[in-house]
Amino acid sequence: ISCSLVGSEMCIRDSIKRVQKYIGNETFMMTYGDGVCDVNIAELVKFHKQHGKLATLTAVVQEQQKGVLDIGQDNSVQAFREKSVNDGAIINAGYMVLEPEVFDTISGDDTIFEQAPLRELAAKGQLMSYVHRGFWQCMDTEREKSMLEKMWASGCAPWEVWNQQ
Protein backbone atom coordinates (compact mmCIF):
# COMPACT_ATOMS: atom_id res chain seq x y z
CA ILE A 1 0.00 0.00 0.00
CA SER A 2 1.29 3.44 -0.91
CA CYS A 3 -0.25 6.65 0.37
CA SER A 4 0.17 10.00 -1.30
CA LEU A 5 -0.18 13.00 0.98
CA VAL A 6 -0.65 15.89 -1.38
CA GLY A 7 -1.67 18.68 0.98
CA SER A 8 -4.98 20.20 1.92
CA GLU A 9 -4.88 22.97 -0.68
CA MET A 10 -4.38 20.73 -3.72
CA CYS A 11 -7.45 19.90 -5.80
CA ILE A 12 -8.32 16.28 -6.52
CA ARG A 13 -7.37 16.59 -10.19
CA ASP A 14 -3.83 17.60 -9.28
CA SER A 15 -3.67 14.93 -6.59
CA ILE A 16 -4.57 12.20 -9.07
CA LYS A 17 -2.21 13.50 -11.75
CA ARG A 18 0.62 13.68 -9.20
CA VAL A 19 0.37 9.93 -8.43
CA GLN A 20 -0.02 8.82 -12.04
CA LYS A 21 3.70 8.10 -12.39
CA TYR A 22 3.52 5.64 -9.46
CA ILE A 23 0.44 3.75 -10.69
CA GLY A 24 1.74 2.30 -13.91
CA ASN A 25 -0.78 -0.19 -15.28
CA GLU A 26 -2.19 -1.20 -11.91
CA THR A 27 -5.69 -0.84 -10.53
CA PHE A 28 -5.60 1.73 -7.73
CA MET A 29 -7.79 3.14 -4.99
CA MET A 30 -8.53 6.72 -4.12
CA THR A 31 -10.32 8.35 -1.23
CA TYR A 32 -10.94 11.99 -0.39
CA GLY A 33 -10.00 11.50 3.25
CA ASP A 34 -12.86 13.62 4.60
CA GLY A 35 -15.09 10.76 5.67
CA VAL A 36 -14.96 7.48 7.53
CA CYS A 37 -16.81 4.24 6.93
CA ASP A 38 -16.73 0.52 7.53
CA VAL A 39 -16.77 -0.50 3.86
CA ASN A 40 -15.24 -3.91 3.20
CA ILE A 41 -12.31 -2.95 0.95
CA ALA A 42 -11.76 -6.53 -0.23
CA GLU A 43 -15.41 -6.79 -1.35
CA LEU A 44 -15.23 -3.37 -3.02
CA VAL A 45 -12.16 -4.39 -5.04
CA LYS A 46 -13.71 -7.79 -5.86
CA PHE A 47 -16.86 -6.05 -7.16
CA HIS A 48 -14.71 -3.73 -9.28
CA LYS A 49 -12.70 -6.57 -10.78
CA GLN A 50 -15.85 -8.59 -11.56
CA HIS A 51 -17.61 -5.91 -13.61
CA GLY A 52 -14.54 -4.93 -15.65
CA LYS A 53 -15.34 -1.20 -15.94
CA LEU A 54 -12.81 1.61 -15.49
CA ALA A 55 -14.18 3.06 -12.26
CA THR A 56 -16.16 2.07 -9.19
CA LEU A 57 -17.31 4.54 -6.58
CA THR A 58 -18.78 3.65 -3.22
CA ALA A 59 -22.36 4.89 -2.92
CA VAL A 60 -24.21 5.56 0.34
CA VAL A 61 -27.64 6.90 1.21
CA GLN A 62 -27.26 10.32 2.79
CA GLU A 63 -30.08 10.75 5.25
CA GLN A 64 -31.90 14.06 5.36
CA GLN A 65 -30.75 16.30 8.19
CA LYS A 66 -34.13 17.99 8.63
CA GLY A 67 -37.80 17.20 8.45
CA VAL A 68 -39.38 17.34 4.99
CA LEU A 69 -42.36 19.51 4.09
CA ASP A 70 -44.78 18.90 1.23
CA ILE A 71 -46.09 22.35 0.31
CA GLY A 72 -49.20 22.98 -1.77
CA GLN A 73 -49.80 25.60 -4.49
CA ASP A 74 -51.10 28.04 -1.87
CA ASN A 75 -48.05 27.50 0.37
CA SER A 76 -50.04 25.44 2.86
CA VAL A 77 -48.20 22.54 4.44
CA GLN A 78 -49.82 19.40 3.02
CA ALA A 79 -47.66 16.94 4.94
CA PHE A 80 -44.72 16.93 7.29
CA ARG A 81 -42.30 14.00 7.48
CA GLU A 82 -39.49 13.69 9.97
CA LYS A 83 -36.13 12.84 8.47
CA SER A 84 -36.06 9.38 6.96
CA VAL A 85 -33.64 7.17 5.05
CA ASN A 86 -36.21 7.15 2.26
CA ASP A 87 -35.81 10.92 1.92
CA GLY A 88 -32.07 10.63 1.38
CA ALA A 89 -30.10 10.90 -1.80
CA ILE A 90 -27.56 8.34 -2.99
CA ILE A 91 -24.18 10.04 -2.94
CA ASN A 92 -20.53 9.32 -3.71
CA ALA A 93 -18.93 8.28 -0.40
CA GLY A 94 -15.46 9.09 -1.72
CA TYR A 95 -13.96 5.59 -1.78
CA MET A 96 -13.08 4.61 -5.36
CA VAL A 97 -11.37 1.81 -7.26
CA LEU A 98 -9.94 3.00 -10.57
CA GLU A 99 -8.12 1.69 -13.59
CA PRO A 100 -5.18 3.73 -14.94
CA GLU A 101 -7.19 4.63 -18.06
CA VAL A 102 -9.11 7.16 -15.92
CA PHE A 103 -6.08 9.45 -16.25
CA ASP A 104 -7.14 9.91 -19.90
CA THR A 105 -10.34 11.65 -18.72
CA ILE A 106 -8.38 14.38 -16.93
CA SER A 107 -7.71 16.70 -19.82
CA GLY A 108 -6.47 20.00 -18.48
CA ASP A 109 -5.73 22.21 -15.53
CA ASP A 110 -9.38 23.21 -15.15
CA THR A 111 -10.69 19.63 -15.03
CA ILE A 112 -12.57 18.85 -11.82
CA PHE A 113 -12.47 15.06 -11.34
CA GLU A 114 -15.93 14.86 -9.75
CA GLN A 115 -17.45 16.67 -12.70
CA ALA A 116 -16.29 16.08 -16.28
CA PRO A 117 -14.27 12.86 -15.79
CA LEU A 118 -16.87 11.04 -13.69
CA ARG A 119 -19.69 12.26 -15.96
CA GLU A 120 -17.74 11.08 -19.02
CA LEU A 121 -17.13 7.67 -17.46
CA ALA A 122 -20.83 7.38 -16.58
CA ALA A 123 -21.92 8.40 -20.10
CA LYS A 124 -19.63 5.75 -21.59
CA GLY A 125 -20.95 3.07 -19.23
CA GLN A 126 -17.59 2.85 -17.45
CA LEU A 127 -18.65 3.98 -13.95
CA MET A 128 -20.19 1.56 -11.48
CA SER A 129 -21.44 2.04 -7.92
CA TYR A 130 -20.78 -0.28 -5.03
CA VAL A 131 -23.67 0.37 -2.67
CA HIS A 132 -22.47 0.40 0.94
CA ARG A 133 -25.22 -0.05 3.52
CA GLY A 134 -23.01 0.13 6.59
CA PHE A 135 -21.60 3.05 8.52
CA TRP A 136 -20.46 6.18 6.67
CA GLN A 137 -20.01 9.71 7.96
CA CYS A 138 -18.48 12.75 6.34
CA MET A 139 -16.31 15.08 8.39
CA ASP A 140 -16.84 18.42 6.69
CA THR A 141 -17.76 20.49 9.74
CA GLU A 142 -16.55 20.96 13.31
CA ARG A 143 -19.82 19.39 14.48
CA GLU A 144 -19.18 16.23 12.45
CA LYS A 145 -15.56 16.10 13.62
CA SER A 146 -16.65 16.42 17.25
CA MET A 147 -19.29 13.71 16.83
CA LEU A 148 -16.74 11.29 15.33
CA GLU A 149 -14.19 12.08 18.05
CA LYS A 150 -16.80 11.33 20.73
CA MET A 151 -17.64 8.03 19.04
CA TRP A 152 -13.94 7.13 18.97
CA ALA A 153 -13.35 8.13 22.61
CA SER A 154 -16.37 6.11 23.76
CA GLY A 155 -15.14 2.97 22.02
CA CYS A 156 -18.12 2.99 19.65
CA ALA A 157 -16.39 3.64 16.32
CA PRO A 158 -18.01 1.42 13.66
CA TRP A 159 -15.18 2.19 11.23
CA GLU A 160 -12.62 0.59 13.56
CA VAL A 161 -12.89 -2.71 11.68
CA TRP A 162 -9.23 -3.69 12.15
CA ASN A 163 -9.97 -4.67 15.78
CA GLN A 164 -12.99 -6.80 14.91
CA GLN A 165 -12.59 -10.55 14.74
Task: Name these PLM-found stretches.
Residues 16-27:
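Active-site nucleotide-sugar/metal-binding loop of Leloir-type enzymes
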Residues 4, 22, 121:
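Conserved catalytic core of Hanks-type protein kinase domains
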Residues 1-7, 11-12:
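Single conserved hydrophobic/aromatic residue that forms the stacking wall/gate
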Residues 51-61:
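A short, conserved acidic/glycine-rich loop-to-beta-strand motif
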Residues 72:
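Extended acidic/charged loop-beta regions that coordinate divalent cations
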Residues 27-29, 36, 42-49, 62-64, ...:
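Catalytic-core segments of class I nucleotidyltransferases/pyrophosphorylases
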Residues 8, 32-35:
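Short acidic donor-binding/metal-coordinating loop in glycosyltransferase active sites
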